[in-house]
């Protein structure tokens, strides 16, 4: 949080020296456990401290075979999961006290302006904050909707879905469940507290009773329309269990829970299912019966298997298993923008490929229209494109609040991101099933070329593209932005206008690239193929289905091929990887 420019980064599993060591000695371990501390554990697994002290090192001695090292790390720690298609579109997020009507009106204006969004992020003001009695503490943690802002939250969530938007809510879970919460009585009874005492239910991830009640509370809100959760953990790394990082276990448990089979208590049994279990009298009221049949019957399974997704902070090596990652509150400065490309690409060295940054910057800093336009451009070519800002009236990211030139650039960036969904979804498959992150440092493909290490702002974006974002203000005299780019040996083409660049020598070619505010340096390789979808109109501007037609950009100079990945949007279809 509040980083303004470069900060130190942890080590990955590669190095220029050819070896790296990952120390896992202090980590807890996941064990099969149906009983914890004498209490039933419905999860069937638990995170436990090691039963004896030991040194647990992993040595990666791959020379400069960087890709192979990271792919083997995935084999050791688990793969990067496949993301749902909507997560690759544009996200709208702002720390702001929207009312229910204001938020929906904003989403409607985006559609009228032809600006596609697929995900709505509602920051912490969805729940009670300012009207919490001080005797309970602050309103930073909350699980009860603010009825003044959202008088009918179920209708609000339903209206978002009707507009083609998924919804995520921001939560700060550290303060537990207190007596003013809607779910307090039920949660208190589950953990053995008399609700009449108004004793706070402590946030305790080492207590199976609390964990079960905690997730049931979330399930109720998911049944009302919440699609996934933004776990905004900021309260340190201490739990009752030695060595157990609460952020890590939160990510682990939330991600597993997000992919559970929904039960009849959360969603009605499939009325169209013709299996024997669903046809039995009383089946729609039997929780256990529905769970049993949903595990073996295709028609029910397809309906009830949720697509796992969470949105949280990085908790160390292995966090790639719990996408998407929130990189923290950023300061609105050129220094912050300059650091993000390097930060994103370098994270791939520990296998962490799905970062979500505060695109445009969150707070403080200064207002600079060129900064915002360049940040939008980087967002288009980032793993996740989530616009975000504080509640300051000067920090809003709506394109119509900027000059015409910058507004057009912003809108173009957001439209291009949505058009790139076929390409992005294919790279999503590549990340999940081939162990190749969407964003890669330049030295992965050219490990023995010194030039590849001299362009920290530059990165490969999937199999076909190379991106060298502009991260400094326009030159006053030229009124253009510039960056120093490096093109590996071969032919390259400007992604936007097709201009050809030849990099003849083995060391590649360094060049200063100048672009107007509506363009950024993006290069396609010779023989590159990039599939784009056409933007819909009106209510279909943010359509997420497989496109009926494609615009395919083909760049000459070499043979090429591209295998487009599509599925029907179900977990069962995506899990096959075919």
Regions found by a protein language model. Name each.
Residues 1-520, 524-525, 568-570, 576:
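Catalytic-domain carbohydrate-binding cleft regions of carbohydrate-active enzymes
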Residues 522-578:
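Accessory, solvent-exposed terminal regions and/or long lumenal/extracellular loops of proteins
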């Amino acid at each position: 949080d509040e980083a303004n420019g470069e900060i130190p980064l942890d080590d990955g599993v590669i190095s220029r020296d050819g070896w790296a060591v990952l120390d896992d000695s202090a980590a807890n371990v996941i064990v099969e456990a149906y009983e914890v501390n004498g209490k039933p554990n419905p999860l069937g697994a638990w995170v436990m401290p090691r039963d004896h002290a030991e040194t647990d090192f992993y040595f990666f001695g791959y020379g400069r075979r960087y890709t192979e090292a990271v792919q083997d790390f995935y084999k050791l720690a688990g793969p990067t999961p496949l993301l749902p298609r909507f997560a690759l579109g544009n996200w709208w997020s702002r720390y702001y006290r929207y009312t229910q009507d204001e938020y929906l009106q904003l989403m409607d204006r985006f559609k009228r302006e032809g600006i596609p969004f697929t995900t709505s992020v509602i920051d912490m003001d969805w729940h009670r904050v300012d009207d919490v009695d001080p005797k309970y503490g602050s309103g930073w943690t909350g699980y009860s909707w603010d009825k003044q802002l959202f008088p009918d939250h179920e209708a609000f969530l339903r209206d978002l879905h009707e507009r083609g938007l998924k919804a995520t809510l921001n939560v700060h879970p550290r303060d537990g469940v207190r007596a003013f919460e809607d779910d307090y009585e039920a949660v208190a009874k589950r953990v053995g507290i008399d609700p009449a005492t108004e004793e706070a239910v402590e946030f305790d991830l080492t207590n199976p009773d609390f964990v079960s009640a905690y997730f049931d509370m979330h399930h109720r809100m998911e049944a009302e329309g919440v699609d996934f959760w933004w776990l905004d953990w900021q309260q340190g790394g201490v739990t009752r269990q030695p060595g157990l990082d609460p952020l890590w276990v939160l990510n682990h448990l939330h991600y597993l829970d997000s992919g559970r089979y929904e039960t009849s208590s959360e969603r009605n049994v499939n009325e169209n299912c013709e299996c024997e279990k669903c046809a039995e009298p009383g089946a729609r009221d039997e929780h256990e019966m529905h769970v049993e049949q949903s595990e073996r019957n295709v028609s029910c399974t397809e309906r009830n298997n949720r697509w796992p997704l969470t949105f949280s902070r990085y908790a160390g090596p292995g966090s790639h298993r719990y996408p998407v990652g929130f990189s923290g509150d950023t300061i609105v400065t050129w220094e912050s923008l300059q650091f993000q490309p390097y930060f994103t690409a370098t994270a791939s060295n520990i296998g962490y490929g799905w970062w979500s940054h505060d695109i445009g910057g969150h707070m403080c800093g200064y207002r600079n229209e060129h900064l915002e336009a360049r940040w939008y451009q980087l967002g288009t070519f980032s793993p996740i494109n989530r616009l975000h800002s504080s509640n300051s009236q000067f920090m809003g990211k709506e394109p119509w609040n900027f000059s015409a030139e910058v507004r057009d650039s912003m809108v173009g960036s957001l439209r291009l991101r949505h058009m790139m969904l076929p390409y992005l979804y294919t790279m999503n498959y590549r990340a999940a099933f081939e162990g190749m992150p969407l964003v890669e440092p330049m030295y992965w493909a050219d490990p023995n070329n010194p030039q590849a290490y001299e362009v920290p702002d530059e990165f490969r974006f999937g199999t076909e593209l190379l991106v060298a974002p502009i991260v400094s203000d326009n030159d006053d005299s030229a009124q253009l932005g510039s960056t120093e780019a490096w093109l590996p040996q071969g032919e390259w083409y400007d992604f936007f206008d097709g201009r050809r660049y030849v990099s003849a020598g083995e060391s590649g070619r360094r060049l200063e690239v100048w672009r107007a505010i509506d363009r950024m340096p993006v290069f396609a390789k010779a023989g590159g193929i990039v599939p784009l979808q056409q933007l819909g109109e009106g209510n279909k501007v943010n359509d997420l289905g497989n496109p009926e037609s494609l615009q395919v950009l083909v760049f000459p100079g070499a043979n090429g091929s591209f295998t487009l990945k599509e599925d029907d949007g179900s977990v069962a279809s995506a899990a096959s990887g075919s």
